[in-house]
Amino acid sequence: MKTIRVVAAVICDSMQAKRKIYATARGYGDYKGQWEFPGGKIEPGETPQQALKREIEEELDTEIAVGNLVGTIEYDYPAFHLSMDCFWCEVISGDLVLKEAEAARWLTKDDIDSVPWLPADQTILDVIRSSMQPVKPLHTSEYDNEPLQRC
């Protein structure tokens, strides 16, 4: 079986806090509409980190910082074996413009399972979830439960 070697960016709001991750819905092929971490194939002569920076620039018009390896997925699809290195990343510059995907969302630890993931990406969600922090509530004041008054 042919092996395809790729990289994926687990883009988070902050590599320290990791409260939200960015996922995209595939816009083409047999798995159209299923969700994945953005990335792509490693070209000859590239390191995984170089490939990831290039792919995110091409797919999302965004510059990223590549952090630590989250893990490597080894997954057998019907037509090929996928070997995918997943890295923590964060945005340095750019607006995450969708050039290939049909949709995108920022997902929290609590709603990471709210989208239909590609089978390979599904296998690393527990590792990602365990590294994420919960989103802090917006209401932190002692006055949060008091009714609003007109000025």
Annotate each predicted stretch with a short phrase:
Residues 18-58:
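Conserved Nudix-box catalytic region and its N-terminal flanking loop in Nudix hydrolases
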Residues 59-66:
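Short secondary-structure junctions
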Residues 63, 72-95, 103-105, 128:
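Active-site-adjacent beta-strand/loop module that shapes the phosphate/pyrophosphate-binding cleft
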Residues 88, 97-128:
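NUDIX/MutT-family hydrolases
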Residues 120-151:
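Charged phosphate-binding loop/patch that engages nucleotide di/tri-phosphates or the phosphate backbone
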